[in-house]
């Protein structure tokens, strides 16, 4: 089993604030079915969980239905305004996954999950963080020496319909000047 956990708030905020510079339109958001398909290529069944902040008492019904149609299990969490309910929910889920066999893929850039990720890396399972590597927390990046994989949601997963306006470090061996001319 591979557990796919999506920090919906974090992915949306990083895409909007750091990559696009504005709130993403539906066409600019990741194609979640591609993310799930990418993870399924690991060759084991996927349990896909999508964490949502529902603290305002609202649930985006059409989005929830779309997630369910793509075989994601929406997990709408609520709490006090100052509580990071999505982070708490993901932390608890990662702790629970540590008690059972299975790989883990987390879509987030957030350092709040470092203790749980570190614990998961100690028993030989495959663990990855998917996102925009240039925005992944340096504390998460430090776990690559323990075996954590960092996977680019755009270039490796192919989760977007059009190229994003990203500025990132390009290894010289990968540099092609044509797109810049």
What is each of the regions a protein language model found here?
Residues 1-84, 126:
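Domain-level signal for Mg2+-assisted phosphodiester chemistry and nucleotide/NA-binding surfaces
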Residues 56-181:
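Nuclease catalytic cores that cleave nucleic-acid phosphodiester bonds
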